[in-house]
A protein has these predicted regions:
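C-terminal catalytic lobe of FAD-dependent flavoproteins
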Residues: 248, 257-258, 273-396, 403-416, ...
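Iron-sulfur (Fe-S) cluster-binding segments and ferredoxin-like electron-carrier domains
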Residues: 404-414, 438-456
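Glycine-rich FAD pyrophosphate-binding loop
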Residues: 22-42
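Dinucleotide-binding Rossmann-like beta1-alpha1 core, especially the glycine-rich loop
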Residues: 46-126, 135, 250-251
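Helical element adjacent to the flavin cofactor pocket in flavoenzyme catalytic cores
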Residues: 138-195
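Flavin-dependent oxidoreductases
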Residues: 15, 175-180, 184-264, 268-278, ...
């Protein structure tokens, strides 16, 4: 029997796995998709929020401030792209200045470090590209930008290195109470566990109701984004917010850790995991963003995408043992600031185990730390040394991002190997540039096929069913599709 079964390996599930892997526990992660970080974690604003927005006294407020501090340390330790650039919440008119005062007071009460109110002149001195109508801003220096999928992947990889078992393409279809724990049914067999951690993201309500009575309702909310070329990457230096409202933190404009500019999201209620982009939604995002930063050149957009966040009717994170289901631990409703809070949320799990006297002393032989090769960032002499040891690093496959064959092979041979073209992209950035894989995609597909020993026709773009190739056209194999 497992000590702990974690359902879901987005950033919250990965953080829970990383935290629990520090202890001599038998832990398994059951992920429904074929890769980690393949839901909300891969499609969000990539912001580690400072923590001034959540209502004081909520779990969100406490865990946001704790989590962003923990995330900074984890990113440094695990070689995750991270930049503490700070954020500005703008008052775009005199009428919005009182709202900044409220956010400031809330931030002070939440323990957000270093926040202060700026005049219009101070704000424009920091960000000259802002709209001239700016009346002031709230500056939060602890806010940061991160690569969210790399954050989750790094924590999951180190957890696996330290004994956590990861089962991909293993959705949980039923949960039953058994003596001493829980029985989880999946298409790949059953798992018995003393504790279950429900980190299933958009599916957390359904998973909860397999084990306990209905106590919360998730409200899936789609957010649409523009990702702009690196030519727009220096448009702003901080994360730029507008005053938040009942729909969230509003449309932001932010640099990314990879040098692009990110603009979005809107907030549209949807049924389930509907990640379609719409003309109306994107038009709204562009118009709203221009209120803050009027000079954005949306013609430099290289990709639109949408993510669905798990808003919840409780107004706060759902964390703790479910009523009437001892040992079943919910980590649900992880809307913003879920990414920021994830490392602190994970520590809530160990607190629950400790309260039951089920948390042993930490391992003394823990294997922490992680690095990966970023060839283009190396000085010339290190590049030469690397190529001499492994010529694959001398063959550039993705010209937009200068990603080498060696880096792609690393992604396919890592502790959690990529199994799709997008999986490679999330691990080493191949296909992340201006052409969005138009040039390197076929070569990446070829490397996946050769390295993993699978038919090119079976190579996926991302999730199950996203086969890139339908048939061979010149060898007589023919197409059987309609």
């Amino acid at each position: 029997m497992l000590d702990v079964a974690i359902i879901g390996c987005g950033v919250v599930g990965a953080a829970a796995a990383y935290e629990l892997s520090h202890y001599p526990l038998h832990v398994a992660v059951l992920e429904a998709e074929n890769d980690v970080a393949d839901g909300t974690t891969k499609a969000n604003s990539a912001i580690l929020h400072a923590g001034y927005d959540p209502e004081t006294g909520t779990q969100m407020a406490r865990l946001n401030v704790q989590g962003v501090a923990l995330a900074k340390k984890i990113c440094a330790r695990l070689d995750v792209p991270y930049r503490q650039c700070g954020s500005l919440v703008l008052a775009l008119s005199q009428a919005e200045l009182p709202h900044l005062q409220k956010l400031y007071a809330n931030g002070v009460a939440n323990g957000v470090p270093g926040i202060r109110l700026l005049t219009a002149e101070e704000t424009l001195a920091m960000e000259p590209q802002l709209a001239p109508t700016v009346a002031g801003a709230l500056f939060a220096p602890s806010a940061a930008i991160v690569s969210p999928w790399e954050f989750a992947l790094a924590m999951a990889e180190v957890a696996v290195r330290n004994g956590v078992e990861l089962y991909r393409s293993t959705p949980v279809t039923n949960i039953e109470k058994i003596d001493g724990g829980w029985q989880l049914t999946t298409p790949n067999g059953s798992f018995a566990a003393r504790y279950v951690v429900n980190a299933a993201g958009l599916n957390a309500q359904a998973i909860h109701e397999m084990a306990a009575p209905h106590t919360f309702t998730l409200e899936p909310t789609r957010g649409e984004y523009y990702l702009l070329d690196k030519s727009e990457g220096n448009r702003v230096n901080h994360v730029i917010f507008q005053c938040p409202n009942e729909n969230g933190k509003g449309v932001l404009v932010a640099p990314t850790v990879h040098g692009n500019l990110l603009v979005g999201p809107n907030a549209q209620p949807v049924a389930g995991d509907d990640t379609a982009c719409t003309a109306d939604g994107l038009a709204f995002v562009a118009a709203a963003a221009r209120r803050s930063v009027p000079g954005i050149r949306f013609g430099e957009s290289i990709r639109n995408f949408a993510g669905v966040r798990a808003n919840v009717d409780t107004g706060d994170f759902v964390i703790g043992e479910a009523d009437g289901a001892p040992g079943f631990i919910d980590l649900a409703g992880m809307k913003s600031p879920g990414l920021s809070s994830a490392p602190a949320v994970a520590k809530e799990v160990t607190k629950i185990l400790a309260a039951h006297n089920d948390l042993p002393e930490p391992k003394t032989n823990y294997k922490d730390g992680r690095t990966r090769v970023r060839f283009k960032e190396l000085p010339p002499e290190q590049k030469a040394e690397l190529i001499a040891k492994n010529p694959a690093y001398g063959r550039v496959i993705c010209r937009c991002e200068t990603i080498t064959e060696g880096e792609i092979l690393d992604a396919l041979q890592s502790e959690i190997p990529a199994v799709s073209i997008d999986g490679v992209k999330r691990r080493c950035n191949a296909g992340m540039g201006r052409c969005q894989g138009g040039f390197c995609g076929p070569r990446v597909l070829e490397l996946i096929s050769k390295t993993l020993g699978i038919d090119p026709l079976d190579v996926l773009q991302d999730k199950a069913g996203t086969n890139v190739l339908l048939c061979e056209t010149k060898t007589g194999r023919g197409c059987n599709h309609g």
